[in-house]
């Protein structure tokens, strides 16, 4: 299966513009032979939407947009992040979600389980955690789709610093996922890339599954997202990497077993910090 990693720069609350960006990248990926296009966390709303989520019209506009994209979808299939209604009767009423869209409808959806409430994150204020999960079926592939923090709780890698009891990725593997896909909006900080690469490598190796990690890119207010999306083999080897600090699109063929394109451009802390500052200021002014 040819899978496109669509590392796009979305704007918080600019739902029509984000939809247009999604469609543009789907068309580009389709021309390259993609069968599935993966977008970052909360693609439709941008990340983080914060108190915009308290506005019913905003949530409804996002739901209408995901319905529109579902009707528009044919081939390739899409994995798109959006804000869904949760099933909680007494909770927040919303979920951080991803939908599998194909052939004119929503084929499946997933609600994020692990909601970070530390540092720059406050997702527990806005969202209810997921309550059920299962792999998404696309053709003969069983996709173990998770969202950002869901990947950051491996019991072996975080042996002494584990924040949650439950590991959605482990559960996805237990239920027969052939392939792991994590859609993220993971902000940049100095030194984080090295830790993230080690973790993703360890998770893919422990579960013996190819792992596709798609990160957001761009600046949204005080947060800067560095992109750097990656693919890891079942042996934990990095097979591909997208550019850091700019939009990018890469096709990964699941038949690939040896390292391919490595597009990362900034390999030391000073260069990464400079690139982050330039991107953050540029997007703050532009958006």
Model region roles, listed by residue range:
Residues 1-287:
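Enzyme catalytic cores with a strong preference for nitrogen-chemistry domains
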């Amino acid at each position: 299966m040819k899978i496109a990693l669509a590392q796009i720069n979305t704007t918080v609350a600019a739902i029509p513009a984000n939809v247009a960006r999604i469609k543009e990248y789907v068309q580009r990926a389709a021309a390259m032979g993609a069968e599935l296009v993966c977008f970052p966390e909360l693609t439709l709303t941008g990340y983080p939407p914060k108190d915009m989520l308290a506005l019913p019209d905003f949530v409804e506009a996002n739901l209408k947009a995901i319905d529109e994209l579902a009707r528009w979808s044919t081939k390739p299939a899409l994995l798109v992040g959006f804000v869904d209604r949760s099933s909680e009767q007494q909770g927040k009423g919303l979920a951080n979600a991803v939908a599998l869209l194909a052939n004119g409808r929503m084929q499946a959806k997933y609600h994020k389980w692990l909601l970070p409430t530390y540092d720059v994150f406050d997702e527990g204020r806005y969202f209810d955690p997921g309550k059920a999960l299962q792999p998404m079926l696309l053709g003969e592939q069983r996709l173990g789709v998770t969202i950002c923090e869901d990947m950051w709780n491996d019991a072996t890698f975080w042996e002494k610093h584990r924040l949650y009891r439950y590991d959605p990725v482990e559960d996805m593997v237990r239920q027969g996922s052939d392939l792991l896909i994590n859609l993220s909006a993971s902000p940049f900080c100095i030194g984080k890339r090295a830790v993230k690469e080690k973790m993703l490598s360890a998770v893919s190796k422990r579960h013996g599954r190819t792992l596709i990690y798609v990160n957001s890119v761009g600046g949204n207010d005080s947060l800067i997202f560095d992109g750097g999306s990656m693919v890891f083999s079942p042996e934990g080897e990095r097979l591909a990497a997208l550019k850091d600090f700019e939009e990018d699109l890469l096709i990964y063929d699941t038949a690939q077993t040896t390292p391919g394109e490595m597009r990362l451009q900034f390999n030391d802390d000073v260069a990464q910090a400079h690139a982050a500052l330039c991107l953050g200021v540029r997007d703050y002014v532009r958006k």
